[in-house]
Amino acid sequence: MDEDTRLRDGPVPRGDEGQRLHSGEGQVRRSGLQGPVAAARAAGTGVYAALDLGTNNCRLLIACPAGDGFRVVDSFSRIIRLGEGISTTGSISDAAIDRALAALSICSDKIRYRRARRLRLIATEACRAASNADGFRDRVAAETGIRLEVIDRETEAALAVIGCSPLLDPQGRGAILFDIGGGSTELVRIARDPDEQDAVPRIKAWMSIPLGVVTLAEHFGGRDVTAQSYAMMVQEVAQYIAPFAAEHGGGLRNMHLLGTSGTVTTLAGVHLNLPRYDRRRVDGIWMSDADITATIARLLGMSYRERANNNCISVERADLVLAGCAILDAIRNAFPLPRLRVADRGLREGMLVEMMREDGALGGCR
């Protein structure tokens, strides 16, 4: 992400009763830094850091307030596949732990170098599911100084909404937001009244399913995907989504899909025929239903090697992208909306906005 990228501050989404969604598991540890890295927080600078350790990716965003949004001063993203094999073994592998520690050490160095004073450092599905997650987090704290907060799925959905709400169509009545992760997928129905000035988006309903690109690809195979295996993936996801769609899939007029995930950003890059992935070209673009169908068909027609050689996919995503497309197709079938807005933003941006609002800091760097 470019250092001068500015993201507008969107309204805080609230639930049916006007209450912000929150973690309901009082026993989870809060995030933070310890050891030598803690000195960065004590320095008192106006810099914020948000880290998202997911099942597939490790992502960091460091920013300071700028007007009604924030200015990114540093970032990091690396595919580490922390959740590789968890669906069969139940634990994080030694190789995955080593990959995560290497990435988190870089994040720790960046946080210290940028003297971030306000931090939120979260972990998601892999650390919710793995039997050795506590030991892994203890080792992360000991070796990198990063103390991870394992968030629940409700909090994950709420942060995605905060991060992506600036991309809601201001003339629309809301969206079906989805976040396709490595080990889980979140769906949120967001409502807004376009006739109200400064209409605040509200979370009407949400759900999370324990399927993501890593778990689905491990179960059905991600390298050599046939029409039959692809259809089976779509059907598997559809079974999880069906009850939510039956209850919350009506009255979709003047709404759109809003997707945040490596799947949709990759799909957008391929759709645009980009020579290499470019966030500035992808974040916020609209794709029609026909665009999505054509691009997925194009990917299904590629071999694993062809996908790996595409610079918007690369070898890191070549065995996962079709599993993500299957999840997207299941969502499209359940919520047949004509447009998708693509978001290259999400949990990190949500954490930054939330922290800055809590501090009353949306007014510039100190």
Task: Tell what function each PLM region has.
Residues 68-82:
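N-terminal glycine-rich anion-binding loops that anchor highly charged ligand groups
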Residues 52-57, 178-184, 260-263, 346:
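A short acidic Gly-Thr/Ser loop motif
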Residues 5, 15, 48, 62-65, ...:
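Helical "lid/coupling" subdomains associated with nucleotide-phosphate turnover
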Residues 57, 75, 175, 182-186, ...:
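Broad gene-expression machinery/nucleic-acid interaction feature
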Residues 43, 73-75, 137:
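Local beta-strand/beta-hairpin segments that build beta-sheet-rich folds
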Residues 44-69:
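N-terminal basic/disordered segments at the start of proteins
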